[in-house]
Design a protein with these regions (language model features):
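Terminal processing/anchoring signals of secreted or surface-associated proteins
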Residues: 12, 21-24, 54, 137, ...
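Membrane-proximal, proline-rich intrinsically disordered regions
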Residues: 21-78, 465-510
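Bacterial Sec-dependent N-terminal signal peptides
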Residues: 1-30
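Bimodal feature
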Residues: 1-3, 20, 45, 185-186, ...
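Structured, solvent-exposed acidic/aromatic patches
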Residues: 79-381, 419-428, 433
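Beta-strand acidic-aromatic groove motif in beta-rich domains, primarily in extracellular
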Residues: 63-72, 149-150, 233-234, 442-447
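Extracellular glycan-recognition regions
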Residues: 24-26, 101, 455
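C-terminal functional modules
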Residues: 376-510
Length: 510
């Protein structure tokens, strides 16, 4: 692993976290004490710098943040990539070190501190506050979906009080509602756009785009809680669609960094290769997006793309890098965080549940999700793909000299929509295609597997520390909480509703 624990903690604790680190996102050279208070207020420089910091946590592309928050968790557990270092302890095998468990939560204090500074400098009455609410919601949705209960006002202290996952979701919904109301009621959006464009790494100051993103987060949330809060979910989803979600690829939430986090961890460092699960589905479906997603391995065989089974006992990272395909990204490839394709699939599921998603049918939104994905990746052949009612996932054949072994296919679901299929078949077909289209957003891929059980994934090829799950339901809390925050930790486990381990389910899984 390419991150030092000491350096990582230093990175988190340095006061310069709100200044020098932001220089990696935009060309801002903040000379610290040389700036007067008046100069800090000029062009909203002070509040803008904290909003940049918030974006760095909400959409982590810096290599250490990306690896510890995204790669080690969602990308591996969502079966997009798999860890190919020799380390025999990781989340896939249900036995990661405490450092791996603690890392995602360690990014909460910086975004909370930055949010509080935005409020101090700006107040709570305009689109700047709305933007901060949206960024915090994006980050905390990930935190709670990794751990379950989580401190909402985390400041890195020893007295952090945990909130239940349900309460966190309710707070995030309220925050997003407040944010969209503030944006809609603002009469100076053109002026605000010009002011904040230098600090907006996603939409260049276009707050109408942030409004669509906030509504899209609400639709994502609604689908996630649909099994445990069906009435609330329907109301939230219908409101989000009515108010306007992301529907065009030009509105997709993407962010550019000076070096793509996925490129750094997978290509430059070589810590991962593509997972056998997504390769087997896409190979079986003859999916033309494969060449956009993956690269051919150095040691090629009968297949152009070869994945490695999740949890494979890696004997040599050097050999694994040669045998298996890596991701097809460059240093400048933008990170992808929410797309029109995902929203179309959410609408498709909503209609399947009886929600009003704007008048379309499940079939229409399902096909729109696939079309949007093909267009997003600039791939031809979508008409042929949509009509394929015979292709299924293929059996996985490991490469000669590989580490995971062969595995028979675990799904027979086809691509073409069938209104006469059973509800289970419809859900499997819909979520399997959604999972393929969500790539490379591993956190959302993992969320879908946990929430629905789809797509079906391969068993792990080695012992999993006594667990019978195919992928964890959550990540355990930092064990240091048992020492330094014991009373609140005990309460957090009560809120969790089960042991502090990999098996206890999320609130929205029950």
């Amino acid at each position: 692993m390419m991150v030092s624990r000491k350096l990582f903690l230093l990175f988190l604790c340095l006061p310069a976290i709100f200044s020098s680190c932001t220089g990696r996102f935009v060309d801002i050279n903040r000379p610290g004490s040389k700036l007067s208070p008046d100069e800090l207020k000029r062009d909203n420089y002070a509040v803008g710098s904290f909003l940049i910091q918030m974006q760095g946590v909400a959409f982590p592309e810096q290599e250490n943040a990306y690896q510890t928050m995204i790669d080690f968790v969602g990308n591996y557990l969502g079966r997009y990539t798999t860890y190919t270092k020799e380390l025999p302890k990781n989340h896939t095998l249900f036995n990661a070190s405490n450092a791996w468990c603690a890392w995602p939560a360690s990014y909460a204090p910086p975004i909370v501190s930055a949010f509080n500074e935005v409020v101090k400098l700006n107040g709570k009455e305009n689109v700047t506050y709305a933007w901060a609410l949206i960024l915090r919601a994006q980050a905390f949705l990930r935190f709670t979906d990794i751990y379950g209960p989580f401190p909402l006002s985390m400041n890195n202290g020893s007295d952090e009080v945990y909130s239940s996952q349900r309460d966190i979701y309710l707070q995030l919904i309220n925050d997003l509602n407040e944010a969209t109301t503030l944006i809609v009621s603002d009469t100076h959006l053109a002026q605000e756009r010009e002011t904040f464009a230098p600090y907006d790494l996603v939409y260049k100051g276009d707050f109408n785009q942030w409004r669509k993103f906030a509504n899209s987060l609400k639709l994502r949330i609604a689908v996630r809680i649909s099994n445990v809060e069906p009435v609330m979910a329907r109301s939230l989803a219908e409101q989000a669609v009515r108010d306007g979600v992301i529907e065009e690829n030009e509105d997709n939430c993407t962010i550019s960094y000076h070096k793509s986090g996925l490129w750094t961890t997978a290509v430059s460092w070589g810590d991962s290769r593509i997972c056998a699960d997504i390769e087997s589905y896409m190979t079986g479906y003859k999916d033309p997006r494969m060449s956009k997603y993956f690269l051919q391995p150095i040691s090629t065989g009968v297949r152009r793309f070869i994945g490695c089974r999740a949890g494979a006992p890696i004997g040599s990272n050097v050999v694994a890098k040669r045998l298996y395909s890596t991701v097809n990204v460059s240093q400048t490839t933008p990170g992808i965080w929410l797309t029109a394709s995902e929203m179309a699939f959410c609408k498709a599921e909503g209609v399947l549940r009886g929600w009003n998603m704007g008048g379309g049918t499940t079939k229409e939104y399902y096909e729109e999700g696939i079309r949007r994905s093909f267009s997003q990746w600039d791939v031809d052949g979508v008409a042929t793909y949509l009509m394929d009612n015979t292709s299924t996932e293929t059996n996985y054949i490991d490469v000669i000299g590989g580490y995971g072994g062969d595995a028979g296919k675990v799904s027979t679901i086809t691509i073409k929509w069938d209104d006469n299929a059973t509800m289970a078949e419809k859900m499997e077909r819909l979520i399997t295609q959604k999972w393929i289209a969500l790539y490379p957003n591993g956190q959302e891929a993992w969320n879908e597997i946990r929430r629905t059980g789809y797509p079906h994934i391969f068993a792990l090829p080695q012992s999993t520390n006594g667990y019978t799950l195919l992928t964890p339901n959550r990540i355990p809390f930092d064990k240091n909480q048992q020492i330094y925050n014991r009373q609140n930790y005990t309460r957090a486990v009560e809120l969790l509703g089960g042991p502090d381990d990999y098996a206890t389910r999320m609130w929205w899984q029950r």
